[in-house]
């Protein structure tokens, strides 16, 4: 597979990230869980065979250190104006080329599923493409071809917002990519798919072996 994609992953400061997950793991600090979700997500993206570069947009020192050590390019969140501004900033930093914005809460993500979705985004109409989350209301992935602005609309009811903005939905069976984690129930569902090593350690579950790498 040809590595053509730059993937932008925005990550909030850990103290305010994933607020609905606070208390999901009573024996673990909330910040540790938020960091684990981000690190497992970024690690899976780095392992994706069609991804050439991963930009993590964050102002959190721990996120910057850990994802940078994993191999991501860390971009300070200069706008500091929310998720969509961070994605736009990362895309502008990346420059021309195939670009995607991805949420940082996909701890079960399989690199092969991300590769399949990104490859699907390069087929058909030359336009922005988005992938709804598991419930179908949010968005986990937004992709654009060279020369087309991402124009992100992440947030509540973002799937409908992206569709209304002219983006086309991606269709495929990619459960680990669509399983974002906002609540304790989401985390349990991600665990059934197989968590990445950092999140699995915190949850006290066995990390998947070869299954997650495909």
UniProtKB/Swiss-Prot annotation:
Pathways involved: Cofactor biosynthesis; coenzyme F420 biosynthesis
Enzyme nomenclature, EC number: 2.7.7.105
SUPFAM superfamilies: Nucleotide-diphospho-sugar transferases
Chain residues that bind phosphoenolpyruvate: 139, 155, 158
Keywords: GTP-binding, Nucleotide-binding, Nucleotidyltransferase, Transferase
Example of a GO biological process term: F420-0 metabolic process
Reaction(s) catalysed by this chain's protein: phosphoenolpyruvate + GTP + H(+) = enolpyruvoyl-2-diphospho-5'-guanosine + diphosphate
Enzyme kind, highest EC tier: transferase
Function: Guanylyltransferase that catalyzes the activation of phosphoenolpyruvate (PEP) as enolpyruvoyl-2-diphospho-5'-guanosine, via the condensation of PEP with GTP. It is involved in the biosynthesis of coenzyme F420, a hydride carrier cofactor.
Protein family membership: Belongs to the CofC family.
HAMAP family with a match to the protein in the record: CofC
Protein name: Phosphoenolpyruvate guanylyltransferase
Organismal lineage: Bacteria, Bacillati, Actinomycetota, Actinomycetes, Micromonosporales
């Amino acid at each position: 597979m040809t590595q053509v994609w730059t993937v932008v992953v925005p990550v909030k400061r850990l103290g305010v990230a994933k607020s609905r997950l606070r208390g999901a793991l009573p024996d673990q600090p909330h910040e540790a869980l938020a960091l684990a979700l981000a690190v497992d997500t970024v690690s899976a993206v780095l392992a994706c065979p069609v991804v050439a570069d991963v930009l993590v947009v964050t102002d959190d020192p721990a996120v910057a250190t850990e994802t940078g050590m994993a191999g991501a390019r860390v971009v300070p969140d200069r706008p500091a104006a929310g998720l969509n501004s961070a994605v736009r900033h990362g895309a502008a930093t990346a420059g021309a080329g195939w670009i995607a914005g991805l949420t940082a809460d996909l701890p079960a993500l399989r690199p092969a599923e991300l590769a399949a979705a990104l490859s699907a985004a390069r087929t058909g109409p030359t336009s922005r493409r988005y992938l709804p989350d598991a419930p179908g209301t949010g968005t986990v992935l937004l992709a654009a071809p060279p020369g087309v602005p991402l124009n992100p609309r992440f947030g509540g009811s973002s799937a409908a917002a992206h569709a209304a903005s002219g983006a086309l939905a991606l269709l495929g069976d990619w459960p680990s990519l669509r399983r974002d984690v906002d609540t304790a129930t989401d985390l349990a569902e991600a665990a059934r798919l197989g968590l990445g090593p950092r999140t699995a350690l915190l949850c006290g579950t066995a990390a998947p072996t070869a299954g997650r790498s495909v």
